[in-house]
Every structure is written in structure tokens, then in C-alpha cells.
């Protein structure tokens, strides 16, 4: 098979026909293939199920999240990856009738964050989230970043100033906005607004950051700037990202989780999943032959 006849993703990832098709794969869609991380875990999803009312969206999902690594969730639309992501910070609690089963344990303490009696507000301070479209508050740039700190009870102007600057620097935005901190956030470009939302998420110093397709509404230049952040952010944070972009998943993630119809199909190191997937459905998806 020549390069021009390989599936587009196989060409993009440099996969050869022998490496993609040369070994027997697991074909049973009811079976998942897991290659656990060698690193210490920051969170551990155990037999997680989730229902929107009577509809079951997740089926006994297991997913280990390695500390200070980027884990990418991939799969076709409707596979449950965004549903899974929003379980981590209890976003589903905002709508009546939704319910969980199983566990999401934060490590090392082993606290099940979806257990009854756990305050979701406290969970969201520990697990931040950046959404698909930039959603700055109708406030100044400064107040967008400081808002989460004020919720935590921080009132010292010196502390607020320091955390705002540090967070904007972490989001690679400080040099672009340092002279207009007290102007409206709506005056920023789309890419700048998304980096502002990242800074806002970083300010309270969360343990885990969730990204739900954070670059899907941005142009390639803005996308590249945000992707560049992941290398630095993983030094201090554990990251879980949902993406439809296979190239992006390959560029930025350490671990890959492929989902289908609310089930975990395969999880393992990103390079292994792309170069040598162990499940036939994973191979079909990443080589563009899925469905």
C-alpha cells in the first residue's frame, strides 16, 4: 500500500499498513482494552454509569487519570466523552433527574466526588473547566481572573494582583493585556478570550483542569497558542481534554481514551494507541474507516 492509498490519519500519523493491520486486534465491542498508566494517579474512574433521566449515557466506564499528564478523550459525536468529562466537576448536578453510578475517586485521599453529601461547589474549586466557546464574564479582564479567588474568600489586593498576573502569564496572555487589565474582556479577540478563560480557571489553583474542545471555535493561529500551553501546564496540573481533532490529540496528549456509545473501548499511552491500537474499533476510528 502506497502512502497515497493509506487512510488520511494513517498518513498523518506516519502509520504503515503493517503496523496498523499486522496484528490481531480485539474485535468484541463489549470488551475494553486498558493499559494502565505507570505514573501516580490523580483520579480514578471506577464503573461509572450516568443517566439523563431514563436514558443511560455512560455504561460502567473505567478510566485512570495520571498525575501531571494530559489525557485525551476521543470518539464519534454522541459517544459520551463530554458527558464523562462533565461528571468530574459535577456539572450534571445543575439539571434535575440526572444521576450517577459508580465512583470517581480523587487521589491520593480516595474521596469519591460523586458520592451523596459531597458539595459540588467545593469539587469545582478543585476541578476547573474550560468550555468549547470562550465565555468571559461581562467584567474587566482583571475581574474575570480575580472572580474565582474572591469566591474563595481572598480579599487582599496584593494577593489578588499577584494571582491575576501569574495566571495571565501561565495562559500566555499577560504581555497582551497588562496595559488594559481594567477594560472589558469583550474587547479581546476570540483566541484571547479563550486564554482569559484558561487564566480564570487557573487562578484558584485547581488540581485538575477539564477542557471540552477548547479550540474548536478558534482559528489555527489561536489554536496553536493554546496547544502550546499544554506542555507548560502539565508541570503543575493534571489535564483531561475532549477533542474531535486526531492530530491535536496526538500532539498534546500523553494518554488516549477512545469511547463508543457510552463505553470505554480502549485506553493507553497515546503513541501506542495511534501506532499499535489493541482494539479493532480504535484502529478503524483513528484511520478514518470508522462507521
Curated annotation (Swiss-Prot):
Membrane topology qualifier: Peripheral membrane protein
Source domain of life: Bacteria
Major localization class: membrane
Enzyme class, broadest EC rank: translocase
GO process terms (BP): phosphate ion transmembrane transport
GO molecular function: ATP binding; ATP hydrolysis activity; ATPase-coupled phosphate ion transmembrane transporter activity
Residue numbers binding ATP: 75-82
Disulfide bonds: none
Pfam families per the UniProt record, alphabetical: ABC_tran
EC numbers for this chain: 7.3.2.1
GO cellular component: plasma membrane
Subunit structure as annotated in this protein's UniProt entry: The complex is composed of two ATP-binding proteins (PstB), two transmembrane proteins (PstC and PstA) and a solute-binding protein (PstS).
Name of the protein: Phosphate import ATP-binding protein PstB
Lineage, top ranks: Bacteria, Pseudomonadati, Pseudomonadota, Betaproteobacteria, Burkholderiales
Family designation: Belongs to the ABC transporter superfamily. Phosphate importer (TC 3.A.1.7) family.
Residues in ABC transporter domain copies: 43-286
UniProt keyword annotations, A-Z: ATP-binding, Cell inner membrane, Cell membrane, Membrane, Nucleotide-binding, Phosphate transport, Translocase, Transport
Amino acid at each position: 500500500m502506497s502512502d497515497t492509498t493509506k487512510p488520511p490519519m494513517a498518513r498523518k500519523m506516519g502509520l504503515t499498513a503493517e503496523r496498523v493491520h499486522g496484528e490481531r486486534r480485539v474485535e468484541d465491542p463489549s470488551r475494553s482494552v486498558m493499559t494502565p498508566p505507570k505514573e501516580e494517579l490523580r483520579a480514578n474512574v471506577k464503573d461509572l454509569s450516568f443517566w439523563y433521566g431514563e436514558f443511560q449515557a455512560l455504561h460502567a466506564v473505567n478510566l485512570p487519570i495520571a498525575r501531571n499528564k494530559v489525557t485525551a478523550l476521543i470518539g464519534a459525536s454522541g459517544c459520551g466523552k463530554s458527558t464523562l468529562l462533565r461528571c468530574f466537576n459535577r456539572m450534571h448536578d445543575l439539571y434535575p433527574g440526572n444521576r450517577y453510578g459508580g465512583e470517581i475517586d480523587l487521589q491520593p485521599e480516595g474521596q469519591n466526588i460523586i458520592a451523596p453529601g459531597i458539595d459540588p461547589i467545593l469539587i469545582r474549586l478543585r476541578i476547573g473547566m474550560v468550555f468549547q466557546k470562550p465565555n468571559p464574564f461581562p467584567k474587566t479582564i482583571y475581574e474575570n481572573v480575580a472572580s474565582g479567588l474572591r469566591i474563595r474568600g481572598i480579599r487582599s489586593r496584593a494577593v489578588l494582583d499577584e494571582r491575576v498576573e501569574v495566571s495571565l502569564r501561565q495562559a500566555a496572555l499577560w504581555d497582551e493585556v497588562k496595559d488594559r487589565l481594567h477594560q472589558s474582556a469583550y474587547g479581546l479577540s476570540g483566541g484571547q478570550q479563550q486564554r482569559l478563560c484558561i487564566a480564570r480557571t487557573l487562578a484558584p489553583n485547581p488540581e485538575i483542569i477539564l477542557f471540552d474542545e477548547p479550540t474548536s471555535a478558534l482559528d489555527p493561529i489561536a489554536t496553536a497558542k493554546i496547544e502550546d500551553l499544554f506542555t507548560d501546564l502539565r508541570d503543575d496540573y493534571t489535564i483531561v481534554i475532549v477533542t474531535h481533532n486526531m492530530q491535536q490529540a496526538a500532539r498534546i496528549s500523553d494518554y488516549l481514551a477512545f469511547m463508543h456509545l457510552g463505553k470505554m473501548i480502549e485506553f493507553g499511552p497515546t503513541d501506542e494507541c495511534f501506532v499499535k491500537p489493541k482494539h479493532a474499533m480504535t484502529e478503524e476510528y483513528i484511520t478514518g474507516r470508522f462507521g
